[in-house]
């Protein structure tokens, strides 16, 4: 909440609000708009007519709950019913029925959809807004060339360009261009009408040659010329109706449909008054665009900034779902048309219900959620990740850009992003700047523009009014950007404030200010707003921090941060992770899996999440926070979820840290930790892995789930029950059988036993053999079985196989190789775990928990971690929690430093520990070496920052290979952990070994351990018998492969082996 001196109050909007508003807009408006477009369908003889009555459409409440949909791998959807009528024109009879159109996936309370049991989210896309844009580019001679680009609603483009002779051309394809006169004439105007509707008729007449007059002599000639240039067809095409239809379909429908937004933009840019419902490009638009282009050539008018947000539009979840619904209705129209014709051909009497099938709508949405680039699997690593994922905005996707073609200018921060798109939070790598995050207060307007709130400053009225402005409106106001404290307390007349005006940042007098920003977090996304003292960090490190907070693993024992920003509670509540009371009442029963609440004559049972797996294998679990018999109010937290404590976000731990070098173990961002973090389960987390197997019906018969698996040791089958499925609560190790399965197969004659052959010869009995295809626990999967699910799809055919899933819980302590990070981009890998007695200790005898490298601070310029570190120490000693808003220097100079030093001073005073704040080196203290007891030479910064354990864990990455598979072509080990691959000794590694002269090791690496087949086979025998390994006498397989490839190019390569005894060259064929 934000209060100001004038009594104005503003609430931070719900972080899922953009998703909810988009889906509601689709249900309320989008469905009806598309249904109204559904045409009346007639048969060929025009005797029967089918139509939908849109006014009576209804969505039915889902038949299953969200939790059941996830558990059974179903889609959480609603059935759509519409009234449809079949009219017989001869008798004027009409049959009306309620028709089931299909299933529409619904949005749940998290702003996500559940499709086939998987949480999916649709992210917002930023596209170029349809309309016309003028720009200037230098050609190869250094002369400015002016162009006007008309962008359609579907992304198609028509470019108008003016050459040095002031002739205007329309570029209809990459290579071909035609005269503006031919295009206007093809669209239906004659020469007289063209000259009457332009401002510069003499320029148009100046490039009208005899050849041009012939082309625009009639509309047919103009269409033929246009068709010839557009399709690049030679010869002389003949005018026909089919030619007009083809041109209409390929050009005018794809490149000339502006849509409602495009029509508004065209009218505004070209000063036209064409009705808004006329959404196609008209000849009048083309001529007005040409007039403006001529004006640009003569220095009149302004060029457009293509990267300004006023020239962009947001394609939200509503637009994407509506597009898919329209596509499904087109498919349904084709189905109905074909069914009517088929019924009449077979002399059947159709009914509305028989004509319509639900398949087009259901399959369209399933393919959209499963295959569309903007529909993504919800990242559920922690509560913050769930919230941030739904607020992403992407330039990528259909109709947008690609990571390889986007320019630096598009990726860069634009002044119009202020208060709308976060300047910090973006992805790292090839998509940097293309995938951003919406700011906290940004919202999407009705025409797809991003709006940001401001307070209006009025001299007449003392009331504060909040305005939401689109990017094209706030350019014309003087907006005060800083010094919010002075603005709240009533500004003096002579005050000078920083402000923003027309994409420039200025310093102006207070009287000129018309609007002001009202919230410190207004410019940042959620991830960046959770970084305390963000103003003291370099932007690159803040970017890393906002990304790494989304990678934090929920810990078994979470802890609230001592130093925060105040947004932690709202992030946790909006994520849906904690259980919140929807009504007030009294707790009458609590359990580990449910809470029963009674009040006002009703009783509500609230189920809790128990050991649920997220798609990143983290554990989602809720713990009861209320006691039986207590009265609670609406909105109170009943149970904490993963990474929440008391309804606040808790991603990490407050750990005692020292910034100092220690025997080189924290070189290059390595981190030294105490064994206390392991033994006391400080950074212990739970992970749930899912393993599944399917049973199919093969050509030899159905696969069987059984515990009777031949040729396997009993030890591997010890955890199976009588059905062949692993028992709940079993502890399983690598290689154990989780599901016993046999697949029937037809064996070869030679593999039959003698008694089987006798049975076949005498009785004709076909003996089938089965192959063992059990589900085995892979490497690194050891743990406790907590759930087994047997999912049987409807139908039971071979296309709907039965699926068995086994869920295994792992407990992971922190270990060497795990990645930890702070909230300022300070990340590192655990390099060594020291005994507590060897860790450096403070003057009160307490050992530190972590040792960071101090050299990681000055070069990275993330000084915010030092402020947080010292303030966290003061907070832990004083038992206080701090919530620090960003840019607190707006209150006074050096506000952050003053706050930290004053709290440290008070902590030292109250705890009678003078070492907490030493005036000679404030924030630093003398500490002692735990091994010797001697003090270190220099005072060291110590404190309690908030440190996170990230999902990049060594248990998921470490891999070793003793034996494994080889590639068939090169005979070298496969690549990657998943394939049990090995590391390849490449060209540069060979150079390094050559540099040390290790010839024997080099020979082993390139022959026995790699791709020399014969030598590889001889190694085992010679090792067992104790003989020396013979040296290979021929070339390895990769060299033979090179020779074969050269042979395919008609090049014969021969090689020679030099004898060690007499160095005679023995010539040998490859």
From Swiss-Prot:
It is found in: Plastid, Chloroplast. Keywords: Chloroplast, DNA-directed RNA polymerase, Nucleotidyltransferase, Plastid, Transcription, Transferase. CDD domains: RNA_pol_B_RPB2. One of its GO terms (biological process) is DNA-templated transcription. It catalyses: RNA(n) + a ribonucleoside 5'-triphosphate = RNA(n+1) + diphosphate. Its EC number is 2.7.7.6. The gene is rpoB. This is DNA-directed RNA polymerase subunit beta.
